[in-house]
Structure formats: structure tokens, C-alpha cells
């Protein structure tokens, strides 16, 4: 059990030390922003439909 914990801990540490490429980070940010905008638009549409 300790070995598994140690392996997972070292894997997490290794994953966190890997530097993400700037392009990948930019893409993730853009995706997140787009997702937020779409969610807000859908919410507004739902509210308008309920009010009508």
C-alpha cells in the first residue's frame, strides 16, 4: 500500500513539474472562455424563454 502511495505521489510530482507549452495553455484558456460564454448565453436564453 505504501508503495502505491509513493508511486502516485511521485507521478503527481512529475506531472506538476512538467512545464506546459505556452500554446497549449493559450488553447485551454480560449476553450474555457468559450465554454463560459456559451454557458452564459444558454442561461440568458433559458431566462428569456421562461419570462415570455
Curated annotation (Swiss-Prot):
It is found in: Endoplasmic reticulum membrane; Sarcoplasmic reticulum membrane; Mitochondrion membrane; Membrane. Gene3D superfamilies: Phospholamban (1.20.5.290). The modification Phosphothreonine is found at residue 17. InterPro entries: PLB. Residues 1-30 are cytoplasmic. The chain crosses the membrane at residues 31-51. The modification N-acetylmethionine is found at residue 1. Keywords: Acetylation, Endoplasmic reticulum, Lipoprotein, Membrane, Mitochondrion, Palmitate, Phosphoprotein, Sarcoplasmic reticulum, Transmembrane, Transmembrane helix. The modification Phosphoserine is found at residue 16. GO terms for cellular component: endoplasmic reticulum membrane; membrane; mitochondrial membrane; sarcoplasmic reticulum; sarcoplasmic reticulum membrane. One of its GO terms (biological process) is visual learning. Reversibly inhibits the activity of ATP2A2/SERCA2 in cardiac sarcoplasmic reticulum by decreasing the apparent affinity of the ATPase for Ca(2+). Binds preferentially to the ATP-bound E1 conformational form of ATP2A2 which predominates at low Ca(2+) concentrations during the diastolic phase of the cardiac cycle. Inhibits ATP2A2 Ca(2+) affinity by disrupting its allosteric activation by ATP. Modulates the contractility of the heart muscle in response to physiological stimuli via its effects on ATP2A2. Homopentamer. Can also form heterooligomers with other sarcoplasmic/endoplasmic reticulum calcium ATPase (SERCA) regulators ARLN, ERLN, SLN and STRIT1/DWORF. Monomer. Interacts with HAX1. Interacts as a monomer with ATP2A2; the interaction decreases ATP2A2 Ca(2+) affinity. Interacts with VMP1; VMP1 competes with PLN and SLN to prevent them from forming an inhibitory complex with ATP2A2. Interacts with S100A1 in a Ca(2+)-dependent manner. NCBIfam families: P_lamban. This is Phospholamban.
